[in-house]
Amino acid sequence: MERGRMLVLDRKPLTPAWASPMRQALEGVQGYKAGMTLAEAARRTGLSAFSKLASNENLLGPSPKVAEAVMAAMAEPHIYPDPHSDVLRAAIGARLGVSPARVVVSPGSEALIDYVFRAVLHPGDSILLSSPTFPTYEIFGRCAEARIIDVPRLANFDIDVPAVCAAAALGPKLLVLCTPNNPTGNALKAADFQAILAATPRSTVVFVDEAYREYHEAFDTFAMLDAWGGPWVSARTFSKAYGLAGLRMGYGVASSPELVDYLDRIRPPFNVTAVSQAAALAAWEDQDYLKRTVDLTIAERGRVEAVLDDMGVEHTESHANFVFLRSPAGPEATAAHLLHQGLIIRPTPVAGGWVRITIGRPADNDALIAALPAALSL
């Protein structure tokens, strides 16, 4: 595709299997497909032990302080949780240097994506994104009957900055930037982020997905967004580096308390449990543990990437807790082979045969390194 050209995705709807009373717009929506569970892996293989390297969880686990906080919160399960997560929002705001009124808490960052898309989009509005990227943007966009404008990424999966700037200048209702990007691991440089913002009208809402930010804190996102001056939301999560994927905890920071107020009108009441709030607060306050786990993960990622380089395997420059690599054997064949070695990875539909593999504990990565040569050369 020539630089600067855009794709407007208009996929044909699925043929309904029954006379559905549901909204017609949902007929063309494919639901999100999560990574394989441990139970499914066991059913398929008959094995009982696996390294789960498909969903970018932190296999090192959360801070030890989380378990104590969870047990304390369980003492009163009959009491509703704080509906606004005020204690957690105050702690987040204090560390990030923003008013708690600009912080929103959600059950996972996917819920925050949903809130923003439903609050912002009318049918026919446009969303600008760059594929391949996290599929829920397109899913929620189609549920909102929005028009998806896709500026495909370059061959190395970096954002095509001039093309995105040209598309952003046309004033989409919502601009989505994922950095580091899922599933490729690429991260925006500060100069490129600044260029995209400079091209974007202040009538556009900018949504920045920073679920993997702890692995690559390259620049002050909030300061650059505030300097731009339009409406924005940055989404972050406790599911990755903080190790709380099973408790579903995400949070975001917005450009203004007024924007958060609109999101609160959509957010269901009591949507974040008392246990999840307590766990997130304990994890948030143990920054020493967070740093140790992030540092170890980055070091282990470098070890895996060095092996890939020695093997001559093409991979991206990942800035997250996973590697994204091309499999000569094909993604499905590679994933199936590794599954029977006790390794669950994520095949992707990205053209060219790419798989995404979470960086696990050192022992998980040892097993992966030992199994990769055969899995990639089937």
Curated annotation (Swiss-Prot):
The family this protein is said to belong to: Belongs to the class-II pyridoxal-phosphate-dependent aminotransferase family. Histidinol-phosphate aminotransferase subfamily.
Q: In which pathway does it act?
A: Amino-acid biosynthesis; L-histidine biosynthesis; L-histidine from 5-phospho-alpha-D-ribose 1-diphosphate: step 7/9
Kindly state which reaction or reactions the protein catalyses: L-histidinol phosphate + 2-oxoglutarate = 3-(imidazol-4-yl)-2-oxopropyl phosphate + L-glutamate
Q: Does the keyword Transferase apply?
A: yes
MF annotations from Gene Ontology: histidinol-phosphate transaminase activity; pyridoxal phosphate binding
Q: Which keywords annotate this record?
A: Amino-acid biosynthesis, Aminotransferase, Histidine biosynthesis, Pyridoxal phosphate, Transferase
The record lists the lineage as:
Bacteria, Pseudomonadati, Pseudomonadota, Alphaproteobacteria, Caulobacterales
The cofactors named for this UniProt entry are: pyridoxal 5'-phosphate
Q: What is this protein called?
A: Histidinol-phosphate aminotransferase 2
The entry describes its oligomerization and partners as:
Homodimer.
Question: Which organism does this sequence originate in?
Answer: Caulobacter vibrioides (strain ATCC 19089 / CIP 103742 / CB 15)
The EC class name is: transferase
